[in-house]
Amino acid sequence: VGIVSRSTEGLNWMQQKMTEVTNLGNETGTLADALKGADIFVGVSAPNIVTPEMVASMNRDAILFAMANPVPEIMPDVAKAAGARVVGTGRSDFPNQVNNVVAFPGIFKGALEGRATQITEEMKLAAAEAIAGLVPEAELNEDNIMPEAFNPKVAELVAEAVKSHIKA
């Protein structure tokens, strides 16, 4: 567990390519090294690999998206106690569920209704902006950055946004 670099052994071709665009300085080290002074952590790996000490070493008001399921890289209450300001997981039983179920039904509905032949970057950005706009400014806070996954407005608004960005 640590920083993936061009010198990391056992990478497939896609992982190797990702190191070229995500680790420009070809940095190496442990996960703890990577989190020192970081503003954000996006984890999609394994349960309980982030410690409170790692979170405490991050910049003030750090954001953590601990997406491993069913057990995240760090539990939200532990991350917050260690200094994180915003924590999201893939789980519906914690605030800020970050899950593709928020995006995909609306993306596919919009693409199908608009008879799109491909999903473009513009369509994905329109979907993201629609999702971001679903939490009213007055309700936006550290524990409410995402719309509820089963909010009936989500799929409809995302579909409309996607349809409006289909190129003929």
Please annotate each region the language model reported:
Residues V1-A46:
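Glycine-rich phosphate/diphosphate-binding loop of Rossmann-like nucleotide-binding domains
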Residues I3, I49, P72:
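Surface-exposed, flexible loop/turn segments at secondary-structure boundaries
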Residues S5-L11, E53-V55, M75-K80, N99:
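Short acidic, glycine/serine/threonine-rich loops at helix termini
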Residues A34-L35, V55-N59:
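A short, aliphatic-rich alpha-helical micro-motif
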Residues S45-V55:
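Glycine/threonine-rich flexible loop motifs
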Residues A62:
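Glycine-centered, small-residue-biased loops immediately flanking beta-strands
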Residues A66-K167:
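Adenosine-phosphate binding glycine-rich loop
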